[in-house]
UniProtKB/Swiss-Prot annotation:
Reactions catalysed: ATP + H2O + polyamine-[polyamine-binding protein]Side 1 = ADP + phosphate + polyamineSide 2 + [polyamine-binding protein]Side 1
EC class of the enzyme, as a word: translocase
Protein name as annotated: Spermidine/putrescine import ATP-binding protein PotA
Gene3D superfamilies, sorted: 2.40.50.100, P-loop containing nucleotide triphosphate hydrolases
Membrane topology category: Peripheral membrane protein
Free-text function comment from the UniProt entry: Part of the ABC transporter complex PotABCD involved in spermidine/putrescine import. Responsible for energy coupling to the transport system.
GO molecular function: ABC-type putrescine transporter activity; ATP binding; ATP hydrolysis activity
GO annotation, cellular component aspect: ATP-binding cassette (ABC) transporter complex
Major site of localization recorded for this protein: membrane
Species assigned in the record: Mycoplasma mycoides subsp. mycoides SC (strain CCUG 32753 / NCTC 10114 / PG1)
Amino acid sequence: MENNILELRNVTKEYDGQVVLKGISFNVKEGEFITLLGPSGCGKTTILKIIGGSQKPNSGEILFEDKNLIPIPINKRQFNTIFQSYALFPHLNVFDNVAFGLTIKKTKKDIIEREVMRQIRQVGLEGYENKKIDELSGGQKQRIAIARALVMKPKVLLLDEPMAALDVKLRKTMQEELKRLQQDIGITFIMVSHDQEEALSMSDRIVVMNQGTIQQIGTPEEIYNEPENAWVANFIGSSNIITDGIFLEDNKIKFDGKVFECIDTNFGENESSIDIIIRPEDIIIKNPNNGFFNAKVIKTTFKGIHWEIVVETSKKRQWIIHTINEYDVDQQVSIKWKPANVHVMWKEVDN
């Protein structure tokens, strides 16, 4: 995955004078699964529409295989889109839905038969060729939408929140299947999602967006473990963010009257324009007087796979902790963490 198949350079978009994309730049490698992740209204779907050709940017460049993509009409782009609604034709059976694009192109019947059946087998629905769309489950409809897109042999598959209409259990199953399918066929997937867990589990890289700007680009591990700002840290899972700490020097921070080790460097000396993040799952609960701070449990919530515990120290700082152990409200404890689980980042600067 070394070659860029797609590149956006300083792309902007306005609707009725409102700027919805503010200089978007990123690249997509050939064979990569990349997710545009962010809350509703952040601009991620607009980017997908611009790449697909249904909308034009106000400014900027888009290169596909090093050639200007913007003037190429939508029907000439080597992309296919899977929409949230799947956009299947209810009056056609499964075979004819998958074959639709090839039929419109007047492809020979023997080629249609071969390619459609190959894709139906690929998505695990052999034997469903003559079924009507309304006879299919949500997961089966999604597979047919995928087969219909892939039969056209696109170089890039665009996915607009494809799992949004599925229930939680089926969504997880389809996430695994879609990732496996992408790895098997090896083409580039660009997916839009507002689901953090979905993006983390499926993507090679994630483009995190908010209010028309890119907040961070990185692998799932980089996004989760090394967020570039407090907004990303809060959006990708819950976080304990210390906004009033000081970076004393390389590998040393200070807050609430105590000095702690960390693994971060190059933030200067006695620097206060930083935020410090410690994830809830990285905090260790100990018996009183065995940690960095003594604290009292003030809230407990069972989350299914763990307990979420909120404790408050004598400094009146509250900490969110994820643990498999149960604690009682008002129970006295202490808390600590490892230096490698402390993450320092620059404070966000308002433009």
